[in-house]
């Protein structure tokens, strides 16, 4: 019998073990679709980004007009740009849902997979931030100024660090050129980290909604989940195309249609919607260093999830009290996102402070306590 190339060829064997014959739990729900959706998002972003980079000029005098030129004169340039800009929003929707799934179903107990995932999130945030600066509109310029300036809160080396990052004494041409270089480089770093993330995942196999081992009744990934993922792709591309074709500027800031002007500060400087929750936490502390630390903690707190798991059950499927807290946390993040988009005035200041406090309280105190309480109730 002729050897099966899919199982004998070194490269094909690797692909086969990752995407075709991969043993998968039979009961994973649609919440497990987001990993593959993130992969498709990354591929879409790299492709559209590459096409945009061919027409972009990383120079303060030309950046804004080169983007306008892409939209006006390049064949389907407007579509490529709209897909790239809105694709970033979809990327973040998928990654936040992916993380939410991880918290709900206790996937963070696969520590290596979880930690590489958080590093992926941080890299994605950095990529999105430097990318937002490239069109060189008002919000691009001032967003870059405000966010990079936060590093000056670091004692002793802060100011030097910021000037080193800027390549001068303010955000200017050197800043734009290096941000373009970084924005081109980081997605490939994300792709590399994704492979590491998957390697760790395939060491242990996927978790499932029951949080119990499913080794005895696993099914092959293809055709079952390859088909299920295909449905996910279609359901994701539908809102992306709708956004890009009907309301491409819905999630953008009107301020960015004005070319960058260092002499005019926009009335409300705010980042893209996917950073607003962290921005609200940053603003809710009336001290620069304190705010920066809270901002960092808002994402880095995820590293503590495996250590704060006190329940004897892995998932929240059969833990109604923890479920209540989880959905409170989700609502809390939505409130923070809304507050981050509002001006710094009453009542938004106090709402933001309370929401920030409850965000950390739920994650650090209430969830572990509830896990322990549920153990007690169930006589574990």
Curated annotation (Swiss-Prot):
<dbReference type="InterPro" id="IPR030689">
    <property type="entry name" value="Cytochrome_b"/>
</dbReference>
<comment type="function">
    <text>Component of the ubiquinol-cytochrome c reductase complex (complex III or cytochrome b-c1 complex) that is part of the mitochondrial respiratory chain. The b-c1 complex mediates electron transfer from ubiquinol to cytochrome c. Contributes to the generation of a proton gradient across the mitochondrial membrane that is then used for ATP synthesis.</text>
</comment>
<dbReference type="GO" id="GO:0005743">
    <property type="term" value="C:mitochondrial inner membrane"/>
</dbReference>
<dbReference type="InterPro" id="IPR027387">
    <property type="entry name" value="Cytb/b6-like_sf"/>
</dbReference>
<keyword id="KW-0349">Heme</keyword>
<keyword id="KW-1133">Transmembrane helix</keyword>
<dbReference type="GO" id="GO:0046872">
    <property type="term" value="F:metal ion binding"/>
</dbReference>
<keyword id="KW-0830">Ubiquinone</keyword>
<feature type="binding site" description="axial binding residue">
    <location>
        <position position="98"/>
    </location>
    <ligand>
        <name>heme b b566</name>
    </ligand>
</feature>
<dbReference type="GO" id="GO:0008121">
    <property type="term" value="F:ubiquinol-cytochrome-c reductase activity"/>
</dbReference>
<feature type="transmembrane region" description="Helical">
    <location>
        <begin position="321"/>
        <end position="341"/>
    </location>
</feature>
<feature type="binding site">
    <location>
        <position position="202"/>
    </location>
    <ligand>
        <name>a ubiquinone</name>
    </ligand>
</feature>
<keyword id="KW-0999">Mitochondrion inner membrane</keyword>
<keyword id="KW-0408">Iron</keyword>
<feature type="transmembrane region" description="Helical">
    <location>
        <begin position="179"/>
        <end position="199"/>
    </location>
</feature>
<feature type="binding site" description="axial binding residue">
    <location>
        <position position="84"/>
    </location>
    <ligand>
        <name>heme b b562</name>
    </ligand>
</feature>
<feature type="transmembrane region" description="Helical">
    <location>
        <begin position="78"/>
        <end position="99"/>
    </location>
</feature>
<protein>
    <recommendedName>
        <fullName>Cytochrome b</fullName>
    </recommendedName>
</protein>
<dbReference type="InterPro" id="IPR016174">
    <property type="entry name" value="Di-haem_cyt_TM"/>
</dbReference>
<keyword id="KW-0813">Transport</keyword>
<dbReference type="GO" id="GO:0006122">
    <property type="term" value="P:mitochondrial electron transport, ubiquinol to cytochrome c"/>
</dbReference>
<keyword id="KW-0812">Transmembrane</keyword>
<dbReference type="GO" id="GO:0045275">
    <property type="term" value="C:respiratory chain complex III"/>
</dbReference>
<feature type="binding site" description="axial binding residue">
    <location>
        <position position="197"/>
    </location>
    <ligand>
        <name>heme b b566</name>
    </ligand>
</feature>
<dbReference type="InterPro" id="IPR048260">
    <property type="entry name" value="Cytochrome_b_C_euk/bac"/>
</dbReference>
<dbReference type="Pfam" id="PF00032">
    <property type="entry name" value="Cytochrom_B_C"/>
</dbReference>
<dbReference type="Pfam" id="PF00033">
    <property type="entry name" value="Cytochrome_B"/>
</dbReference>
<feature type="transmembrane region" description="Helical">
    <location>
        <begin position="227"/>
        <end position="247"/>
    </location>
</feature>
<feature type="transmembrane region" description="Helical">
    <location>
        <begin position="289"/>
        <end position="309"/>
    </location>
</feature>
<comment type="similarity">
    <text>Belongs to the cytochrome b family.</text>
</comment>
<feature type="transmembrane region" description="Helical">
    <location>
        <begin position="34"/>
        <end position="54"/>
    </location>
</feature>
<keyword id="KW-0679">Respiratory chain</keyword>
<feature type="transmembrane region" description="Helical">
    <location>
        <begin position="114"/>
        <end position="134"/>
    </location>
</feature>
<keyword id="KW-0496">Mitochondrion</keyword>
<comment type="subunit">
    <text>The cytochrome bc1 complex contains 11 subunits: 3 respiratory subunits (MT-CYB, CYC1 and UQCRFS1), 2 core proteins (UQCRC1 and UQCRC2) and 6 low-molecular weight proteins (UQCRH/QCR6, UQCRB/QCR7, UQCRQ/QCR8, UQCR10/QCR9, UQCR11/QCR10 and a cleavage product of UQCRFS1). This cytochrome bc1 complex then forms a dimer.</text>
</comment>
<dbReference type="InterPro" id="IPR005797">
    <property type="entry name" value="Cyt_b/b6_N"/>
</dbReference>
<keyword id="KW-0479">Metal-binding</keyword>
<keyword id="KW-0472">Membrane</keyword>
<dbReference type="InterPro" id="IPR036150">
    <property type="entry name" value="Cyt_b/b6_C_sf"/>
</dbReference>
<dbReference type="InterPro" id="IPR005798">
    <property type="entry name" value="Cyt_b/b6_C"/>
</dbReference>
<feature type="transmembrane region" description="Helical">
    <location>
        <begin position="348"/>
        <end position="368"/>
    </location>
</feature>
<keyword id="KW-0249">Electron transport</keyword>
């Amino acid at each position: 019998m002729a050897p099966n190339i899919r199982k004998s060829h070194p490269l094909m064997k690797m692909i086969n073990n990752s995407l075709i014959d991969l043993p998968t739990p039979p009961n994973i729900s649609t919440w497990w679709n987001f990993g593959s959706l993130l992969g498709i998002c990354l591929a879409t972003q790299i492709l559209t980004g590459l096409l945009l980079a061919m027409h972009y000029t990383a120079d303060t005098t030309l950046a804004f007009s080169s983007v306008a030129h892409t939209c006006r004169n390049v064949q389907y340039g407007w579509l490529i740009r709209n897909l790239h800009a809105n694709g970033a929003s979809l990327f973040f929707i998928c990654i936040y849902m992916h993380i939410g799934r991880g918290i709900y179903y206790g996937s963070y107990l696969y520590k290596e997979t979880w930690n590489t995932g958080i590093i992926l999130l941080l890299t994605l945030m950095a990529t999105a931030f430097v990318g937002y600066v490239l069109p060189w509109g008002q919000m691009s310029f001032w967003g870059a100024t405000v966010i990079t300036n936060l590093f000056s809160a670091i004692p002793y080396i802060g100011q030097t660090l910021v000037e080193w990052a800027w390549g001068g004494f303010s955000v200017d041409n050197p800043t734009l050129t290096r941000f373009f270089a970084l924005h081109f480089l980081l997605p490939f770093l994300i792709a590399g980290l994704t492979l590491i993330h998957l390697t760790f995942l395939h060491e242990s196999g996927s978790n499932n909604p029951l949080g119990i081992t499913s080794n005895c009744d696993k099914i092959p990934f293809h055709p079952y989940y390859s088909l299920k993922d295909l449905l996910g792709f279609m359901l994701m591309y539908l809102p992306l195309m709708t956004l890009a074709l009907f309301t491409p500027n819905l999630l953008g800031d009107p301020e960015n249609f004005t070319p960058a002007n260092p002499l005019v500060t926009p009335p409300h400087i705010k980042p893209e919607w996917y950073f607003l929750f962290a921005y609200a936490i940053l603003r809710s502390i009336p001290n620069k260093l304190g705010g920066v630390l809270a901002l960092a903690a808002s994402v880095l707190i995820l590293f503590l999830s495996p250590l704060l798991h006190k329940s004897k059950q892995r998932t929240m499927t059969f833990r109604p009290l923890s479920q209540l807290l989880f959905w409170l946390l989700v609502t809390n993040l939505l409130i923070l996102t809304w507050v981050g988009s509002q001006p710094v005035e009453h009542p938004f200041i106090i709402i933001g402070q309370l929401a920030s406090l409850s965000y950390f309280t739920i994650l650090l105190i209430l969830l572990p306590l509830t896990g322990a309480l549920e153990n007690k109730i169930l006589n574990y």
